[in-house]
Amino acid sequence: MARRTKEEAQETRSTIMMEALGLFCQHGVATTSLSDIARAAGVTRGAIYWHFKDKEELFLALWHEMCAPLSHLLNASIDVDEPDPLGKFTTFLIEVLRTVAMCPAHQLMFRIMFKMMQPDSELTSIRALIQDEIQQHTQNMRCSLTNAVHRGQLPSTLSVERAAILLHCSVDGLIMNWLNQHERFDLAADAEALVQALIFSLRHNLGQP
């Protein structure tokens, strides 16, 4: 009985999160209330508060839920003992693009994120949360690239800072363009070639000034 209750609680939590994701994308994070989410999920506001302190915590839980399936690849690439950090990092970038292309929930999350990062974003508290997560992600990229340099997989002259900026902006740009114009290219099919082109540029350019 206790196990069933735990399973039901997890199902309720997942339902709340998925309904919130759709409403956030459709109506905006700021204008979507917890009452709106409760109605869509078929639960009470109290049920939401049982799982989440507030809307910010709910949004952050959604963010981490989207990131979790790929985190092991990025974590491996920032491990100083990993023998192939560049390989793990390359696979991570490819899988990010493929996952967005094939998973509607990830597409919704990126649409929300891109909207929230605009200068006139309506909810500064969640925008700050996103900025913190992006800064941590960029730092992890720098660690991955540094490990690759130390392993001789990238040139010692590589500017890790510039490389991280290039990769972050390129991946975001590919996702944003694909979300706006699916017909321009096949993100899932082209993911490996696009990422390999970026890695090639790191091997041959972006040296220190």
Describe every region a protein language model picked out.
Residues F52, L60-M66:
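Alpha-helical DNA-contacting segments of helix-turn-helix folds
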Residues A61, N75-L108, V160-L167, G207-Q208:
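Hydrophobic alpha-helical connector segments
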Residues K88, A101-A128, M176:
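Amphipathic alpha-helical segments used for helix-helix packing
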Residues M1-H27, T31-V43, E57-L60:
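Basic, helix-initiating cap at the start of DNA-binding domains
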Residues A68-S71, N75-A76, G87, M102, ...:
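Amphipathic alpha-helical packing segments from all-alpha helical-bundle domains
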Residues I112-K115, R142, L158-N177, D190-S201:
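Hydrophobic alpha-helical segments that form the core
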Residues G42-F52:
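Short hydrophobic/aromatic patch on the recognition helix
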